[in-house]
């Protein structure tokens, strides 16, 4: 498994696509009740690219994210992250790879109520052989002054910052976010999106954000749209994407 992770790190330093999804298919149910949720999705993202995946409820966005993150299996297709074809990994290696190399941020924070902000993040720090320095991370997330507080003592936005810190502390190459601002009011949502942009600048991880909110697309290098399980748009945001990355 260590050699697998080493290959992922080496691949991340090249100019190839960091995340490559080919022919991804997923359905639920059987026979007449069978529903195709993803229909042959092809996506390639560069290292450090921010991708916003848009689409109405039921379009397959969360299923796509779950499969890319190894939380669900695909019916067909392959997923390569940092040079590692994770769809080929046996279950035990996939679990270890996911813990070490992927970060997840969800709409609901799922913080441990009896742990402080620092302790909630430290829980995930030990899963990585190369974690980020805790003090630096807390400061960059604006949580330093709240580090000894418990979840019930901080706001929803601060709780989401803590959840982001929990995902980042492992120093992942790929950060997967499912409606990260869905439970927040407008002003706090704006702050969290600005934080995600800062995270991308500071740590260079590839970020995929799933949302139904078109307003989020301004922060993306790439904008994907799903409709009824099909990829109907794959657009580059040339206003913020460096020219050297306009090749994907």
Predicted regions and their residues:
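ABC family nucleotide-binding domain
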Residues: 17-220, 225-226
């Amino acid at each position: 498994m260590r050699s697998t992770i080493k290959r992922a790190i080496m691949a991340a330093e090249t100019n190839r696509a960091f995340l490559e999804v080919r022919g991804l298919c997923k359905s639920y149910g059987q026979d007449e009740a069978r529903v195709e949720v993803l229909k042959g999705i092809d996506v390639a993202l560069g290292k450090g690219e921010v991708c916003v995946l848009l689409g109405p409820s039921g379009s397959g966005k969360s299923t796509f994210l779950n499969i890319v993150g190894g939380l669900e299996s695909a019916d067909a297709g392959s997923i390569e992250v940092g040079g590692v074809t994770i769809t080929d990994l046996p279950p035990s290696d996939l679990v270890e790879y996911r813990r070490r190399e992927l970060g997840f941020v969800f709409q609901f924070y799922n913080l441990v109520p009896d742990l402080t902000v620092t302790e909630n993040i430290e829980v995930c720090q030990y899963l990585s052989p190369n974690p980020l320095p805790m003090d630096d991370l807390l400061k960059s997330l604006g949580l330093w002054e709240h580090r000894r507080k418990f979840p019930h003592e901080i706001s929803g936005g601060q709780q989401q910052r803590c959840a982001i810190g929990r995902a980042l502390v492992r120093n992942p190459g790929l950060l997967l976010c499912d409606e990260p601002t869905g439970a927040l009011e407008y002003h706090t949502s704006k702050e969290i999106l600005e934080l995600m942009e800062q995270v991308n600048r500071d740590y260079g991880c590839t970020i995929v954000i799933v949302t139904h909110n078109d307003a989020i697309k301004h922060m993306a290098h790439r904008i994907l749209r799903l409709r009824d399980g099909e990829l109907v748009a794959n657009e580059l945001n040339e206003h913020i994407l460096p020219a050297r990355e306009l090749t994907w």
